């Protein structure tokens, strides 16, 4: 962002340039064990939270930690994918994503922060048929940001579909799914979280190699897990304390 402020001559600019030249994307997957996954699922069930919102809290807390405690964090959350039969072979599909912006102080306890994100998401879902492209245009007009800039660098998709075969005749056939990058993307970091056959979860990080390395994804996953499991173990602990202890 500091580089973008210098480039555009605006010391108060709240947006960074989107990489438009070197668009190569790499993928790094991490597998979360079934027992640990079940702990997250149980926490969500017991506190009436969605897994998406818990994951958003983990990402935003990490971003806050590495940005000097920044309280104002926005993450783009994909809320639906729509595809037609023709799109199966066209190389694309229609996706709908919305920015989830929350301002959470370090004094806020973990559970309250999760509910704050959930309340924000519930308000967003009411407008899930709104064109994301129009949102981008409106943000640019409202905040007077230059073209091809963005405040968001992280994107999330959670796929709540357990990988199980209901047909007992096919139950012994093992299944395996893996995400592959198409080689180019304008999104800095795109995380897809899905369930695995053994009851665990797969965290698939797609990242632009122009500015990010595999080690960056390793750190993101490591601290996300530290934050989430610290939070569900001690939901009354403040976000600030969690950031200090992890």
Regions found by a protein language model. Give the residues of each.
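Aromatic/hydrophobic pocket-lining residues that form π-stacking "cages" and hydrophobic walls in ligand
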Residues: 40
């Amino acid at each position: 962002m500091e580089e973008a402020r210098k480039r555009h001559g605006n010391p108060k600019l709240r947006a960074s340039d989107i990489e438009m030249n070197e668009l190569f994307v790499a993928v790094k997957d991490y597998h979360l064990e079934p027992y640990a996954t079940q702990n997250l699922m149980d926490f969500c069930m017991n506190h009436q939270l969605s897994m998406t919102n818990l994951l958003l809290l983990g990402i935003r807390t990490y971003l806050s930690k590495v940005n000097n405690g920044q309280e104002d964090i926005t993450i783009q959350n994909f809320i639906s994918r729509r595809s037609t039969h023709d799109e199966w072979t066209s190389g694309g599909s229609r996706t709908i994503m919305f920015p989830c912006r929350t301002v959470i102080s370090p004094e806020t306890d973990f559970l309250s922060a999760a509910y704050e994100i959930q309340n924000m998401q519930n308000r967003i879902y009411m407008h899930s048929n709104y064109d994301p492209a129009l949102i981008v245009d409106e943000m640019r007009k409202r905040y007077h940001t230059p073209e091809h800039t963005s405040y968001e660098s992280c994107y999330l998709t959670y796929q709540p579909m357990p990988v199980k075969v209901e047909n007992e005749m096919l139950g012994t056939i093992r299944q395996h799914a893996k995400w592959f990058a198409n080689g180019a993307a304008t999104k800095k970091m795109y995380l897809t979280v899905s369930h695995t056959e053994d009851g665990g979860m797969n965290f698939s990080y797609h990242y632009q190699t122009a500015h990010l390395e595999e080690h960056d994804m390793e750190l993101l996953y490591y601290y996300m897990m530290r934050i989430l499991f610290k939070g569900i173990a001690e939901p009354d602990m403040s976000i600030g304390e969690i950031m200090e202890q992890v």
